[in-house]
Design a protein with these regions (language model features):
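An acidic-aromatic
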Residues: 22-72
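Short, solvent-exposed coil/turn segments at beta-strand boundaries
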Residues: 17-22, 39-44, 81-83, 99
Length: 99
């Protein structure tokens, strides 16, 4: 779940982490309906939010401020890759994952 004062997003999440630290997050509402996808490594990210039409890709150092919370998820998952529950707050954004 993703929540701000004005937005709530609930869906099924698939998280992939590679041994080299590559991160992939896909949030969907059932088969074939992808709401959001994020691919990220140490230096680069690609973000597609189909539910808002927001898209961005490039070096992390050039990321728009509104993506900072999403781009912080990689580090959260890398700290405890086998965690069943993850709660992460970044500014006014709250992320909650339960696997």
């Amino acid at each position: 779940m993703y929540r701000t004062a004005k937005t709530t997003l609930i869906g099924e999440a698939i998280v992939r982490l590679s041994k080299s630290g590559d991160f992939e997050l896909t949030v969907s509402k059932g088969p074939g309906i992808t709401l959001l996808s994020l691919r990220q490594d140490v230096e680069f990210a690609e973000f597609n939010a189909n539910f808002t039409g927001q898209r961005w890709s490039g070096p992390l150092t050039e990321a728009p401020p509104q993506l900072r919370g999403w781009l912080g998820l990689r580090d959260q998952f890398l700290r405890a890759p086998n965690r069943k529950t993850l709660r992460y707050v970044s500014g006014s954004e709250m992320f909650f994952f339960h696997f």
